[in-house]
């Protein structure tokens, strides 16, 4: 799952307990096979973006919950977040986590 992928890519790094985190989630959906060539091109050019489920808030919850006790101790450390949905020929989810510096 996502936790295992994170552990491999981050070499097991866990953010400190007092960290304030910024999480950016990029969800790439498969282009529907029924899409015309013109529509597919518009989807891949980001002129058309996914408006189907899951909703952005559910994506954020699923991703952040799955990183509890893996990337951070609790997702309450996330103080800023963004979820963006796109189409791609390689469906996937990319997650970027940054620690916000104090002061």
Give residue ranges: language-model regions.
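Short, small-residue-biased leader/transition segments that mark boundaries at the very start
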Residues: 1-6
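Context-gated lysine
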Residues: 33, 37-40, 52-53, 61, ...
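C-terminal edge-of-domain segments
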Residues: 76-103
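Intrinsically disordered, low-complexity boundary segments flanking structured domains
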Residues: 9-15, 68, 81-84
């Amino acid at each position: 799952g996502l936790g295992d992928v994170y552990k491999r890519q981050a070499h097991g790094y866990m953010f400190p307990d007092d960290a304030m985190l910024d999480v950016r989630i990029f969800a790439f959906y498969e282009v529907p096979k029924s899409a015309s060539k013109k529509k597919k091109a518009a989807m891949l050019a980001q002129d058309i973006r996914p408006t189907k489920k899951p909703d952005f808030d559910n994506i954020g919850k699923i991703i952040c919950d799955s990183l509890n006790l893996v990337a951070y101790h609790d997702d309450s450390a996330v103080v800023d977040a963004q979820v963006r949905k796109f189409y791609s020929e390689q469906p996937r989810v990319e997650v970027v986590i940054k620690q916000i510096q104090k002061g």
